[in-house]
């Protein structure tokens, strides 16, 4: 939706290193040869897209990529979009607990913080990597099993918000790199959602960016490391009309559009 640890030291230091991969990452097989890994899907700058999290997915929208709710949509919806030549992104929250999701009871009270401003949601203590990794892994399993091409993990910028936990920039880097590794282990691409301040640190770990309102907050230039690396920036504005941002974001190579705040099917692309 739109919105602006207890771990041993050695594990935390490993996570802070670029290119972190968890113990489940592919490695040498029993013969000592490295296992072949299919490169994750990576949208190119300028790719057209649709982002719909509210209501039944309107599959008639002319866009190369659809970003839709991973829980609310079935494998049949993903397959139908694939049959139309679309790539499909699985929206899930990574940084918040949601009381309306089927796995809500699996999250212990110790990781739940303050409300993030949305009904039924609370920030997560992203320092607790050992607790959150298997929970998020199961969500990403769902995305993979439904056939999604990539994941949009929401709320990867908790350290800049009032979460109820003393989160640091280093905590966020460690968590975000873990999230990226979980997607890659499952053969899916992964988006850096917002977290503009850490773009330069994370561009090598993520396959594309999803951003809300960089024009509104004069932050779009900070996202150019993605387009310079040949990776799409999928961008929306809510309050600004297209005439206020399209000229700028076209020059930057972004995939920009105006959307309603509830992210229904309506869109006005640049």
Regions found by a protein language model. Give the residues of each.
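Secretory targeting and sorting signals
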Residues: 1-26
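Glycan-processing catalytic domains of CAZymes
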Residues: 4, 9, 29-270
